A protein has these predicted regions:
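…primarily DNA-binding HTH/wHTH and HhH modules…
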Residues: 144-175
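Structural signal for hydrophobic
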Residues: 95, 137-138, 159
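Major-groove DNA-recognition helix of helix-turn-helix-type DNA-binding domains
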Residues: 127-135
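Basic nucleic-acid-binding alpha-helical/helix-turn surface characteristic of O6-alkylguanine DNA
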Residues: 1-117, 165-175
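Short Lys/Arg-enriched helix C-cap and helix-to-coil transition segments
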Residues: 134-142
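Helix-turn-helix DNA-binding helix
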Residues: 121-122
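Short amphipathic alpha-helical/adjacent loop interface patches that line ligand
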Residues: 57, 61, 130, 153
């Protein structure tokens, strides 16, 4: 008789329509592995069957929708950190503590808190954040302005408005 290790379940992926556009969520049995912002979400295949990964992806979808509707300030999700190295993970976890809902932190301050000397290195890590929104890289700003954002500055501005960090923009077109 041969013992065969059980096959790991395939990751589950879903795409959900939200107030900011389509968002993709990838989950494994370990937790949420990736969140894809609008423009990126269309590239992920929708997969998964009943099981822990599918349940995790569904829970993430509910929480992301609630957040984007202004009905949730924190996420209660298990995260799969397998796509990031230890330093990157430490920076992202520090970000979650340093910048809760409605609070920003500068690239330089996040660097000081994590021992990363160059704020540009923090910027690179934010651009490679596999879990945007859940790990709030949109709350990291430049010392003299918004800084960049993988989802674009318009989306960053909208998220900061949602959290009350920036005032809503006036609609001067009357639409």
């Amino acid at each position: 008789m041969t013992n065969v290790a059980p096959r790991a379940r395939s990751p589950a992926s879903i795409v959900l329509e939200t107030t900011i556009g389509a968002i993709g969520v990838e989950a494994t049995d370990e937790g949420v592995r990736r969140v894809h912002l609008p423009g990126d979400a269309a590239r992920i295949p929708v997969t998964g069957d009943a099981g822990p990964a599918s349940d995790t992806a569904d829970a993430a979808a509910v929480q992301l929708r609630d957040y984007l509707r202004g009905e949730r300030e924190t996420f209660d999700l298990t995260l799969d950190w397998s796509d990031v190295d230890q330093l990157h993970r430490r920076v992202l976890e520090t970000l979650c503590d340093a910048a809760p809902f409605g609070v920003t932190v500068t690239y330089g301050e996040l660097g000081r808190r994590t021992g990363v000397d160059d704020p540009r290195d923090i910027g690179v890590m934010m651009s490679r954040n596999p879990l945007p929104l859940v790990v709030p890289c949109h709350r990291v700003v430049a010392a003299d302005g918004l800084g960049g954002y993988g989802g674009g500055l318009d989306l960053k501005r909208r998220l900061l408005e949602l959290e009350g960090i920036l005032p809503p923009r006036l609609d001067l077109d009357g639409a």
